[in-house]
């Protein structure tokens, strides 16, 4: 199997992109894939924190590019079998940390891994171009709110200049609001952004680490990426019908 490199990106910050990267990586690894997560959000990186690996980091991707260590020396093994982190650089980035050189690092890891997920900075500036230029495909993370969808639409359009047809992950979806029609549905978002939704992640209050995140929606997303099968999770399923209407009223109270 040829390694697939996927950039996880978003137009708007704060949509949960880094958490999606970590949870999707875990789900892919639990399907038996060898997965490396590369944190390309230089300066604002926290993928190591979400994974609970911040105290194990010795080298980072800049050290690899600057030949201060080999790529395998910089890898940090996560608690999930087959899941590894290539940490982001802290502080000043030299001129050698480019999309081309990040891609060379990924190419060097390709014989060992099935998937490389690259956590991209929010926005569409230099960090975006560096991360996207190193990858072959893209997942755009958004929430079902108008400001996030507007920014995601810009990112989807921009990715076409890289000859990418990204798919979408809709994060932080409240099932009660979806069932009552107060936020757009999966189909409506697909029509708006002209892209396929591969994953729908329900809202989870106060969860910021990998161990506490629900696994089911990410397992479903991983199976769609690996096998092209199944449908994304429907967070509104429990809020439809007679009893669902009661649950919606209780949610509002």
Residue ranges and their predicted role:
Residues 2-40:
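Walker A/P-loop phosphate-binding motif and the immediately C-terminal alpha-helix
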Residues 29, 132, 160:
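Gly/Ala-rich phosphate-binding loop of Rossmann-like dinucleotide-binding domains
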Residues 149-165:
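Conserved C-terminal guanine-recognition region of P-loop GTPase G domains, centered on the G4
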Residues 125-146:
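Inter-motif core of Ras-like GTPase G domains
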Residues 161-253:
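C-terminal lobe/tail of nucleotide-utilizing enzymes
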Residues 42-44, 91-92, 123, 145-146, ...:
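Conserved nucleotide-binding/hydrolysis micro-motifs of P-loop NTPases
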Residues 37, 118, 140, 168-170:
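Structural beta-sheet core signal
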Residues 37-111, 207-211:
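P-loop/Walker-type NTP enzyme "switch/lid" segment
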């Amino acid at each position: 199997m040829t390694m697939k490199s996927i950039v996880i990106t978003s137009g708007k910050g704060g949509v949960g992109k880094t958490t999606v990267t970590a949870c999707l990586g875990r789900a892919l690894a639990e399907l038996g894939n060898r997965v490396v997560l590369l944190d390309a959000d230089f300066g604002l990186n926290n993928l190591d924190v979400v994974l609970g690996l911040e105290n194990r980091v010795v080298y980072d991707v800049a050290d690899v590019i600057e030949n201060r260590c080999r790529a395998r020396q910089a890898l940090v093994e996560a608690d999930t079998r087959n899941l590894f982190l290539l940490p982001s650089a802290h502080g000043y980035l030299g001129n050698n940390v480019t999309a081309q050189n990040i891609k060379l690092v990924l190419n060097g890891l390709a014989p060992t891994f099935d998937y490389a997920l690259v956590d991209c900075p929010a926005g569409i500036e230099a960090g975006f171009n560096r991360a996207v230029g190193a990858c072959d495909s893209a997942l755009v993370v958004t929430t079902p709110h108008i400001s996030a969808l507007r920014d995601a639409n810009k990112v989807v359009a921009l990715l076409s200049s890289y000859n990418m047809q990204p798919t979408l992950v809709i994060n932080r979806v409240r099932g009660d609001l979806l069932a009552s029609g107060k936020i757009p549905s999966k189909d409506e978002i697909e029509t708006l952004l002209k892209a396929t939704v591969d994953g729908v992640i329900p809202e989870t209050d106060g969860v910021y680490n990998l161990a506490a995140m629900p696994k089911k929606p990410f397992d479903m997303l991983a199976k769609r990426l690996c096998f092209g099968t199944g449908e994304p999770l429907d967070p509104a399923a429990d809020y439809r019908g007679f009893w669902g209407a009661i649950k919606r009223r209780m949610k509002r109270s």
